[in-house]
Amino acid sequence: FQLSRGLPPPARVGVLLRCSKDLQQVKWLGLGPHENYPDRKASAFLGCYEAQVRDLHVPYIVPSENGAHQETRWLALHSTDSTNMCFFTAVDNFSFSVSNFSAFELARCQHQHELTPDEHVNVHLDAFHMGLGGDCSWFPCVHEEFVASSRRYSFRFLVAGVSGAAQLLDAYSYRLPAEPTDAKEVEK
């Protein structure tokens, strides 16, 4: 990704994936168990966590983007009645959020009761996520180190469908190499 100098900094640099609505179970190795952001993560701890998608939603009075998790090593989504899952990992630690609501829906609504669940599970995988700011009650300013700078961003990640309990252990221990050595390694 290349950010242009003439544009305001984006809130995130990454990708949005829309997954099957059946994938309501979430497991991750990263900071948790509660939502955390680059400038709001002192109370979050590195660990392996599990939750349902609905439980990752934070019901702020006015709906807004929420539920981010920083320093993630891997993320897995699966349904309750299957050992099949969708697995995500990356070369570098990443930020993620998983929601039954689209970003458009969160921005459109003024109250929680107005939210309509999406037909998909929305998965954001981010190489960079802006901080929240607001540590000064007069201004919602975000400190410079937590704002996306005009530079090139690189984000190498893997999305894989995994089936069966034996492959789950392999998936949980897999990390992408920093640089692919051959095509077989990338396909792994």
Residue ranges: model-predicted function:
Residues Q2-K188:
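Beta-strand/loop-rich accessory regions of lumenal/periplasmic or secreted enzymes
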